[in-house]
């Protein structure tokens, strides 16, 4: 799910940047340090939409760097248990398949794939095929899945997904 949140960060800047272009340089540094990162609390920071406040700087006695407190608004992507997402299949194995929904990596185990779909080891491309042959899941296919659980690391979020419910599975 996507959110538009107000966040804050302490930005450490070299004193040589404290000049007439301070706000521009601080904004550029904030973009490069924050966009595309993942925090366990908020999720993936997709993009910064605005910089609302840049505090007066405080000089760190130990290093000489200047610390600014920056308040900004950002678009955040945080997956939740039970959420339904569209994803692209990236890898298929006999244990299940991996898919990606934006920056989120999702694993769908064979236990969470409909029982009528079996792994086809004889195929040129590894895939899951339904017994009647009407449906096939292989690399680069688009699937609709439901998140069953998430695991948060320091810099990534992983999810377990399922296509065993109604209206889930291959799209198209």
Curated annotation (Swiss-Prot):
Keywords: DNA-directed RNA polymerase, Nucleus, Transcription. DNA-dependent RNA polymerase catalyzes the transcription of DNA into RNA using the four ribonucleoside triphosphates as substrates. Component of RNA polymerase II which synthesizes mRNA precursors and many functional non-coding RNAs. Pol II is the central component of the basal RNA polymerase II transcription machinery. It is composed of mobile elements that move relative to each other. RPB7 is part of a subcomplex with RPB4 that binds to a pocket formed by RPB1, RPB2 and RPB6 at the base of the clamp element. Its main location: nucleus. This is DNA-directed RNA polymerase II subunit rpb7. GO terms for biological process: nuclear-transcribed mRNA catabolic process; positive regulation of nuclear-transcribed mRNA poly(A) tail shortening; positive regulation of translational initiation; transcription by RNA polymerase II; transcription initiation at RNA polymerase II promoter. Gene3D superfamilies: Nucleic acid-binding proteins, RNA polymerase Rpb7-like, N-terminal domain. GO terms for molecular function: DNA-directed RNA polymerase activity; single-stranded DNA binding; single-stranded RNA binding; translation initiation factor binding. One of its GO terms (cellular component) is RNA polymerase II, holoenzyme. Belongs to the eukaryotic RPB7/RPC8 RNA polymerase subunit family. InterPro entries: NA-bd_OB-fold, RNA_pol_Rpb7-like_N_sf, Rpb7-like, Rpb7-like_N, S1_domain. It holds the Pfam family SHS2_Rpb7-N. It comes from Dictyostelium discoideum (Social amoeba). It is found in: Nucleus. Component of the RNA polymerase II (Pol II) complex consisting of 12 subunits. RPB4 and RPB7 form a subcomplex that protrudes from the 10-subunit Pol II core complex.
